[in-house]
């Protein structure tokens, strides 16, 4: 059953039983396709919407005729990253200004700002940082019906009309059968008022329009208005309470609210949803007709009275222009009114309109008008093109309003259905292109205001397009979107998989979406319509669960923004599965019966079983083969890329699979990547689509290979050069390094992998290491998921990773003169300067530790007023060395490493720098981090733990042939967690290693227990996969046999080096004078309320006293205590803590006179700590490592720099809760989306 498959240059033995009928699509197509649409269509739409901009008088008009994007960005992607600039290209727009009085036309090209470009990896470079725009899942515009029950159990129907932008219409019923409407969330009016306002004046007209409905009659009784004018005034009063209503102003307001495309927009998708829901065909199908229905054009009888209307007939009835049909429901006649739309390609017309390629339904009134007025084909086709906006209106129409009300009345009789808002047919994806288009539209709307104002101010004859247009609002809108939108995120670049899944992420949060607090359980839950569209597994744990999800492997987004998934069509007549692939959205899929991908087929693709297990909406049903409509394409179609990389996913509990797919994104790239022995076959596709590897652009022969360049000579003699990235820093500080995997003289094909990137091995994703594990406890070192590892993994650098930190030093202009980058630093010995060059910048290759100088820099100090004598001496003996202080860039606490790169930017060399900065130096320091105690490791099945001990190789348990284990895991971690996949992986890994195989075991279609048992027996292992182990310390055999094998283990980004932290003295908070908290602020460990109780319980009075005074906020006491420790004296009595003084001040602010009195009645003066307190010993003790302990950051900043700081460091005052490092930190899979 096992067969070899090729993945890149490696052959894997695949256990898959199902043939792949469809290639997995390009995984970052979502991003690329959407941005491409924005450049080609999106921009055009926005410019067309806003053109022409007319002056208030109407004699000037400004039109945006055309636009182009120059295809030469100023810097390449790599240069932009180095220079902290944005990768963008100038947008040029052709503008036409028409003077309608004189007929004069001025045309010119206007620069409209730089538009950020998408890199070929689907990301943007904004200010040097790589960012991703996450797609957003929002409610689709359209009309939604909902039912609720009042306290008497009576069914009430509610409807909401949601446009893309514009006023909402909400229809509601009360218990007395009166239907009301709310316009734009204002007070409600009876529905008949709205009907009168759109032209149905009298009660008879209304009843005639919608049928003699009880609810309509009850509503008419409630309605006080009697004509269109009264109705308009009634609506005006609701919308503009307090303003005097006139019929004219009421009519113009009402029309502007709903029928002005600038104010009201359904968007393409809204129109599509409206027509789908309200058109006749879906509503009358499968009901009996109450009357004979005749085609008004041909006179043909379509349906006889009492005959059941089939789907095909219903479509025919609608497409011949019939808009009202009466049907029989339980013996009652119910009138169904559509929204007057037809499919133009099926409407009986004398001309062929297929060349126009109109997919949407069109308004039949406008169509008839065109056909009546024009007689020859060319004129009709032209008129149809010109009147597209009327045929397919973007705003709501009167027909739509009538159809909405008709649908609501029909629902009372059980005709139609209510909507489920969590169904993916009612939620759509807004990708980059659309989000960007909306931002651009906002910018242009602001620009329009400016242009109109300028048109009135400037002289009509002198005016030019350039001086009318101010591009500032457009540029600002785009900058704001990329810089600070919730959906523009700093790319997760830990490894190639995290990049890939970040680009495929779908978020329900963000502007126009949900908020974490408001989102209930239903929105977050897995829905049956997610099948094949949104992964049920990959979502963060914590407050964002279910709100942030991932697209599945085969999913794609259609033009309306709905997620589609592919199916194979089944020929119902013969029960044969064809190779025809159909992509379907969630609401289309609801109509069909769909078989699973693993349903057995014979060699002719016929179903083998008599009954086929299928899905129909949320039901699982069993049907004969002739009733099946479609079949899944692949078993992995229901999961995302991350989840499809977990072998034996089907044997893991869903909660653990979730952790497994999230933790793969946190694996750090290792020094020696190694592809998994037991994979799923998805590793190659994931690595290639992530953009981490380099692919050959053409066929050819490798001419030259060096560490950072590959040259390939193509068939036609051209040379392709490929430049590799060497030891670059990723967004997360991991190392990006590419290595060639071809040799000189090799023949390569187009699309072949020629260079590996981080975490890839021969073109396959390689996030971890294959290690020999045994499931056995060892001396309690596996307690609570802890992991015992062998020293071998440390010595061989098996789990070693490289991390690169970036440090910046800027030389600015200050009030007292410019800062200077120099080697001449006051009070620093030559020893500290040994690695600096003559400019004062560290040399590449230097090894640095915490506190070492990276860039020498001095800042001028304020000079005191000189006396006359000093000035005289100064004049005679020349300038004394100017007073400067040392502000060098030093390696922060706890950091060390080797300098791998230094970049210097300065004004003189013409580099762009922020205002006030003359020179900038950027130093990159790399660290090699071996695996160490406290690091977090995990498998792919959610089995995570922290390393508790590193044991010498000779002490590890060993196999009968003397091979020592590399890792011991706790067997108790398996049963309760129900992730049995790890055990199967271990067994299969053992066999594969013995046979020298690499294995592909795809999800839901991989190796079975039987397959593994057979292989174990064949390879000479015990069929239960257990081995006798011996104690490495004594050589004695253990009592029981142990499960041993190869498992793929990942080293995660939660490294102990980043979490370790210690402090003796450091910065203090401003108000409370207590130490700050957290590693980033170099803070202390919080000794909280509960810890105080513990010391109180033990009666440890002295410890408790110093905890609360000299170790915290007794300002004088801590200085004296430090001095005493340095001098070796006894520590003096503590004073009054600052927090007590703060408390006293707060009480005094409540007008309570608080005094502190000693036992013998002496009053103690309470004075808040100030800089110039006399009783503070000399500050030369250099207690505060971080500079002046009491100065607010603003002051320090202003002394050094001329301008005000833009943002203050946030360590001025901290909430007391974030002081202690939470032990949970190690186990929280922190998802950056949170």
Curated annotation (Swiss-Prot):
It catalyses: RNA(n) + a ribonucleoside 5'-triphosphate = RNA(n+1) + diphosphate. Transmembrane segments: none annotated. Gene3D superfamilies: 2.40.50.100, 2.40.50.150, 3.90.1100.10, DNA-directed RNA polymerase, subunit 2, domain 6, RNA polymerase alpha subunit dimerisation domain, RNA polymerase Rpb2, domain 2. InterPro entries: DNA-dir_RNA_pol_bsu_external_1, DNA-dir_RNA_pol_su2, DNA-dir_RNAP_su2_dom, DNA-dir_RNAP_su2_hyb_sf, RNA_pol_bsu_bac, RNA_pol_bsu_CS, RNA_pol_bsu_protrusion, RNA_pol_Rpb2_2. Residues 1192-1234 have a biased composition (Acidic residues). Keywords: DNA-directed RNA polymerase, Nucleotidyltransferase, Transcription, Transferase. GO terms for biological process: DNA-templated transcription. One of its GO terms (cellular component) is DNA-directed RNA polymerase complex. Its EC number is 2.7.7.6. Belongs to the RNA polymerase beta chain family. This is DNA-directed RNA polymerase subunit beta. It comes from Caldanaerobacter subterraneus subsp. tengcongensis (strain DSM 15242 / JCM 11007 / NBRC 100824 / MB4) (Thermoanaerobacter tengcongensis).
């Amino acid at each position: 059953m096992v067969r070899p498959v090729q993945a890149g240059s490696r052959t894997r033995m695949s256990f898959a039983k199902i043939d792949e009928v469809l290639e997995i699509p390009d995984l970052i197509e979502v991003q690329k396709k959407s941005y491409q649409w924005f450049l080609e269509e999106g921009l055009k739409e926005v410019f067309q919407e806003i053109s022409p901009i007319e002056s208030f008088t109407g004699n000037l008009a400004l039109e945006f005729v055309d636009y182009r994007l120059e295809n030469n960005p100023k810097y390449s992607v790599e240069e932009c990253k180095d220079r902290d600039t944005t990768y963008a290209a100038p947008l040029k727009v052709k503008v036409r200004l028409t003077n309608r009085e004189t007929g004069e036309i001025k045309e010119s090209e206007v620069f409209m700002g730089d538009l950020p470009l998408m890199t070929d990896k689907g990301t943007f470079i904004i200010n040097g940082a790589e960012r991703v725009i996450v797609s957003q899942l929002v409610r689709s515009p359209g009309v939604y019906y909902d039912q609720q029950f009042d306290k008497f159990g009576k069914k009430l129907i509610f409807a909401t009309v949601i446009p893309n932008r514009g006023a909402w219409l909400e229809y509601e019923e009360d218990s007395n059968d009166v239907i009301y409407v709310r316009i734009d969330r204002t007070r409600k009016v009876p529905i008949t008022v709205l009907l009168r306002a759109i032209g149905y004046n009298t009660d008879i007209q209304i009843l005639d329009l919608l049928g003699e409905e009880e609810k309509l009659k009850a509503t008419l009784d409630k309605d006080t208005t009697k004509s269109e004018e009264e109705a308009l005034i009634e609506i005006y009063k609701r919308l503009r309470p307090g303003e005097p209503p006139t019929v004219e102003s009421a009519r113009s307001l009402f029309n502007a609210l709903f029928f002005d495309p600038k104010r009201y927009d359904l968007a393409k998708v809204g129109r599509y949803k409206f027509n789908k829901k309200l058109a006749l065909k879906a509503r009358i199908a499968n009901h009996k007709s109450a009357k004979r229905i005749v085609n008004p054009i041909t006179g043909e009888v379509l349906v006889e009275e009492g005959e059941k209307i089939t789907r095909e007939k219903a479509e025919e009835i609608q497409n011949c222009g019939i808009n009202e049909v009466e049907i029989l429901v339980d013996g009652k006649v119910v009138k169904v009114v559509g929204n007057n739309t037809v499919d133009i390609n099926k409407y009986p017309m004398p001309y062929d309109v297929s060349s126009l390629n109109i997919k949407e339904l069109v308004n039949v009134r406008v169509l008839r008008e065109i056909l009546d007025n024009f007689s020859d084909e060319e004129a009709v086709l032209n008129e149809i093109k010109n009147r597209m906006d009327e045929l397919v209106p973007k705003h709501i129409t009167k027909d739509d309003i009538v159809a909405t009300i008709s649908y609501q009345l029909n629902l009372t009789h059980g005709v139609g259905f209510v909507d489920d808002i969590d169904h993916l047919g009612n939620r759509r994806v807004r990708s980059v292109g659309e989000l960007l288009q909306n931002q651009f539209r906002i910018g242009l709307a602001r620009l329009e205001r400016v242009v109109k104002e300028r048109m009135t101010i400037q002289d009509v004859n002198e005016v030019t397009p350039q001086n009318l247009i101010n591009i500032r609002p457009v540029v600002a809108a785009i900058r704001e979107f990329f810089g600070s939108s919730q959906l523009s995120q700093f790319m997760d670049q830990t490894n190639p998989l995290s990049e890939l899944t970040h680009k495929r992420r779908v978020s329900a949060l963000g502007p126009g979406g949900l908020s974490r607090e408001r989102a209930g359980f239903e929105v977050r839950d897995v829905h049956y319509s997610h099948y094949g569209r949104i992964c049920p597994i990959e979502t963060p744990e914590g407050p964002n669960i279910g709100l942030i999800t991932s697209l599945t492997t085969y999913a794609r987004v259609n033009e309306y923004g709905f997620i589609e998934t592919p199916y194979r069509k089944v020929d119902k007549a013969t029960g044969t599965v064809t190779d025809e692939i159909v992509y379907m959205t969630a609401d289309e899929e609801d109509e069909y019966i769909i078989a699973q991908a693993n349903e057995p087929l014979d060699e002719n693709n016929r179903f083998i079983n008599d009954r086929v297990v299928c899905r129909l909406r949320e039901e699982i049903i069993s049907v004969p083969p002739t009733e099946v409509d479609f079949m899944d394409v692949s078993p992995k179609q229901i999961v995302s890329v991350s989840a499809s990389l977990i072998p034996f996913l089907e044997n893991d509990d869903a909660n653990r699979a979730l952790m497994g797919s999230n933790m793969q994104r946190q694996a750090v790239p290792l020094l020696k990547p190694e592809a998994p022995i037991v994979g799923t076959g998805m590793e190659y596709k994931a690595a290639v689509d992530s953009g981490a590897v380099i692919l050959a652009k053409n066929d050819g022969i490798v001419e030259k290979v060096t560490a950072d360049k590959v040259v390939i000579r193509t068939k036609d003699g051209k040379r392709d050069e490929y430049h590799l990235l060497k030891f670059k820093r990723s967004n997360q500080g991991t190392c990006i390094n590419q290595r060639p995997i071809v040799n000189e003289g090799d023949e390569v094909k187009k699309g072949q992998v020629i260079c590996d990137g981080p975490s890839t091995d021969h073109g396959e994703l390689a996030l971890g290491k294959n290690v020999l594990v045994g499931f056995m406890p060892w001396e309690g070192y596996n307690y609570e998921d802890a992991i015992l590892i062998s020293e071998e993994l440390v010595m061989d650098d098996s789990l070693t990773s490289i991390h690169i930190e970036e440090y910046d030093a800027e030389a600015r202009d200050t009030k007292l003169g410019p800062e200077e980058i120099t080697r001449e630093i006051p009070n620093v010995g030559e020893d500290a300067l040994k690695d600096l060059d003559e400019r004062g910048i560290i040399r590449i290759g230097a090894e640095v530790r915490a506190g070492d100088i990276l860039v020498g820099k001095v800042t001028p100090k304020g000079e005191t007023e000189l006396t006359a004598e000093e000035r005289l001496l100064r004049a005679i003996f020349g300038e004394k060395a100017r007073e400067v202080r040392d502000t060098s860039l030093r390696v922060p606490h706890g950091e060390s490493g080797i300098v791998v790169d230094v970049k210097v930017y300065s004004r003189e060399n013409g580099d762009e720098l922020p205002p006030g900065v003359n020179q900038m130096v950027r130093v990159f320091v790399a660290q090699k981090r071996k695996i160490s105690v406290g690091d977090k490791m995990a498998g792919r099945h959610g089995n995570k733990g922290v390393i508790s001990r590193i044991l010498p190789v000779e002490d590890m348990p060993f196999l009968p042939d003397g091979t020592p284990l590399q890792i011991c895991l706790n067997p108790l971690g398996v049963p309760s967690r129900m992730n049995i996949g790890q055990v199967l992986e271990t067994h299969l890994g053992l066999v594969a290693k013995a046979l020298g195989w690499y294995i592909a075991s795809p999800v839901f279609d991989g190796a079975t227990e039987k397959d593994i048992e057979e292989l174990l027996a064949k390879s000479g292992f015990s069929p239960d996969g257990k081995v006798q182990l011996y104690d490495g310390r004594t050589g004695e055999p253990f009592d029981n046999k142990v499960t041993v094998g190869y498992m793929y283990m990942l080293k995660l980004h939660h490294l102990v080096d980043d979490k370790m932290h210690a402090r003796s003295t450091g910065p203090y908070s401003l108000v409370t004078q207590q130490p700050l908290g957290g590693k980033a602020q170099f803070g202390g460990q919080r000794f909280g309320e509960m810890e105080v109780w513990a010391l109180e319980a033990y009666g440890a009075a002295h410890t408790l006293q110093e905890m609360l005074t000299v170790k915290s906020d007794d300002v004088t006491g801590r200085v004296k205590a430090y001095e005493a420790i340095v001098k070796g004296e006894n520590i003096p009595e503590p004073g009054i803590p600052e927090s007590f003084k703060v408390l006293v001040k707060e009480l005094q602010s409540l007008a309570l006179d608080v005094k502190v009195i000693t036992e013998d009645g002496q009053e103690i003066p309470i004075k808040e700590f100030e800089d110039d307190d006399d009783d503070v010993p000399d500050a030369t003790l250099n207690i505060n490592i971080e500079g002046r302990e009491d100065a607010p950051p603003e002051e320090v900043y202003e002394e050094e720099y001329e301008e005000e700081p833009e943002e203050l460091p946030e360590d001025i005052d901290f909430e007391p809760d974030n002081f202690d490092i939470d032990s949970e930190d190690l186990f929280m899979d922190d998802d950056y989306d949170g």
